[in-house]
């Protein structure tokens, strides 16, 4: 793969033109070595048992180096193919039969966004596109030519900027493969909360539970997908992938970066984090897969810090009074979770199944037919799940509103969408019969009854915590809309819970603890390196001294 030095490669670090593919690959292999520190490189050599960097490895060996236990064949295949593509950077269009340990190290550099941008020397480089290409390219063996294909030399910046002339509009990722990738990201989210946390997780144990949450993200990418079986006959385009990453799941790829960075730590430098231990307590709604899904949207220090159970309807009863008694003493942000079964036919349900629903229909204004555009994934009697971040303490507001600009509605099932506050004053808790509202003005309450006034993007919960309605009809309210078609969904509430999050001080402290763990591991790496004293044999094994190599920076 061109790991050996070439006399034709310019010694200047600013070289941009190369006479052959071999020279180009060799130069970027060496540059990758300079973007990992000396302790990291020594640790990596220890993890691969001192094997030469140009030695080849197979799928099982890659899983061992990544410390992934019980990965299924699909996961092994997609990770191996991803590394196989990135190992040949910047000539990612041309993939080779063998993956080497140098290729794994180069992949580690490329999948770390900060290192990658430094590696390519372009702050505007589209890292998300690179990840997509690594998942999408069909791998083929190609003989390396010693000369460029034209009379011109190889222009490295052009090769990088054009992704080696890969046409992303022609690429697709099978939806089945993307589902496995999304499931892996969710499965590893809690275990990779820092780069050197111990991966003490059997990823096959709860795979199906995480896959259910991953399917919601997949449906957002491709709305033609309803079930996991539909993934067998659909694909995901780059545009679909990019749109979801940018607007719905900004943190989705973080576990991939952390997973790859584990190769730079020896076992003795890995730590057991409190966040990686089983959740205590859990509930019907708060599970590890759900928190992993939330972590694709919100910072992981918010999601994986010690959540406090405040109110669970199944335990305390479905009433505003119970909610108030349990949740109102919490003087910090909280997450409201609401799950229910969508009501597909209002009149039939009110007449034949639940006559109390007729009262809710009378109080809640009907959406115009021309504004109702229901996606297939949201049609019928489906489970709906919403998580709402309330950044201020709960309080009774029978006339006013509370809630700041950080209020966010996240739909988690059957698709994932994010609706952020556009202005403060977006929540009410009305004990006079108005119920709970997110994104709406106060309901009109008279002796004759209640009239809800739903905002353009809003979640309305009736005062008995029995029925709810989610509306998404565009701009104009206190919550901004998503890119999904306008629609409204009423549902029977089956579970409602409120969980307390740490305040800014607590979250900052949690983040500092995790940062300290990473810094401490790096400090131990440096101490361990110094302890070898003048053992040049180890350093030569790592390729840091001798053989005219300068090594990485400490």
Curated annotation (Swiss-Prot):
Subcellular locations according to the entry: Cytoplasm
Domain TLDc: 284-502
RNA-binding among keywords: no
Domain of life the protein comes from: Eukaryota
UniProt keyword annotations, A-Z: Cytoplasm
InterPro entries for this protein: TLDc_dom
Presence of keyword Calcium: no
A Pfam cross-reference name: TLD
GO cellular component assignments: cytoplasm
Function of the molecule: May be involved in a process influencing telomere capping.
Family: Belongs to the RTC5 family.
Protein name stated in the entry: Restriction of telomere capping protein 5
């Amino acid at each position: 793969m061109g790991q050996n030095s070439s006399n034709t490669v310019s010694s200047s670090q600013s070289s941009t033109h190369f006479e052959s593919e071999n020279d180009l690959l060799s130069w970027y292999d060496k540059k990758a070595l300079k973007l990992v520190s000396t302790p990291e490189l020594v640790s990596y050599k220890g993890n691969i048992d001192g094997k030469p960097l140009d030695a080849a490895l197979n799928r099982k060996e890659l899983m061992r180096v990544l410390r992934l236990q019980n990965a299924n064949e699909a996961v092994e295949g997609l990770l191996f193919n991803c590394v196989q593509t990135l190992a040949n950077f910047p000539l990612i269009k041309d993939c080779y039969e063998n993956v080497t340990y140098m290729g794994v190290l180069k992949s580690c550099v490329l999948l770390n966004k900060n290192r990658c941008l430094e590696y390519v020397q372009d702050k505007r480089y589209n890292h998300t596109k690179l990840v997509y290409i690594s998942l999408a390219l069909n791998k083929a063996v190609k003989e390396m030519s010693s000369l460029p294909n034209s009379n011109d030399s190889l222009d490295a910046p052009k090769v990088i900027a054009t992704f080696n002339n890969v046409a992303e509009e022609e690429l697709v990722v099978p939806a089945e493969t993307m589902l496995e990738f999304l499931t892996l990201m969710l499965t590893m989210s809690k275990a990779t909360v820092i780069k050197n946390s111990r991966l003490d997780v059997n990823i096959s144990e709860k795979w199906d539970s995480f896959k259910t949450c991953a399917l919601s993200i997949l449906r957002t990418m491709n709305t033609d997908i309803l079930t996991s079986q539909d993934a067998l006959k659909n694909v995901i385009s780059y545009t679909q992938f990019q749109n979801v990453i940018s607007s719905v799941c900004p943190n989705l790829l973080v576990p991939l970066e952390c997973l790859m960075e584990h190769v730079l730590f020896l076992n003795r430098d890995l730590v057991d984090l409190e966040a990686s231990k089983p959740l205590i307590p859990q509930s019907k709604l708060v599970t590890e897969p759900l928190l992993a899904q939330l972590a694709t949207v919100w910072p992981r220090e918010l999601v994986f810090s010690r959540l406090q159970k405040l109110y669970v309807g199944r335990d305390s009863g479905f009433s505003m009074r119970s909610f108030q008694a349990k949740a109102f003493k919490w003087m910090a942000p909280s997450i409201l979770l609401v799950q229910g079964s969508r009501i597909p036919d209002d009149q039939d349900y009110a007449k034949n199944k639940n006559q109390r629903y007729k009262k809710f229909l009378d109080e809640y204004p009907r959406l115009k037919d021309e504004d109702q555009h229901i996606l297939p994934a949201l049609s019928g009697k489906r489970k709906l799940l919403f998580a709402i971040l309330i950044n201020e303490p709960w309080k009774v507001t029978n006339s006013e509103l509370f809630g700041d600009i950080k209020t966010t509605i996240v739909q988690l099932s059957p698709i994932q969408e994010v609706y952020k506050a556009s202005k403060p004053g977006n929540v009410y808790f009305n004990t006079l019969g108005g119920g709970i509202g997110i994104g709406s003005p106060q309901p009109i309450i008279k002796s004759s009854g209640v009239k809800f006034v739903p905002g353009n993007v809003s979640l309305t919960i009736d005062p008995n915590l029995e029925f709810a309605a989610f509306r998404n009809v565009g701009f104009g309210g206190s919550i901004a809309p998503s890119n999904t078609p306008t629609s409204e969904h009423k549902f029977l509430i089956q579970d409602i819970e409120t969980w307390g999050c740490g305040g800014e001080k607590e979250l900052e402290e949690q983040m500092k603890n995790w940062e300290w763990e990473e810094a401490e591991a790096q400090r131990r790496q440096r101490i361990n390196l110094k302890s070898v004293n003048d053992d040049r044999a180890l350093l030569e094994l790592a390729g840091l001294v001798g053989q005219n190599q300068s090594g990485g920076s400490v």
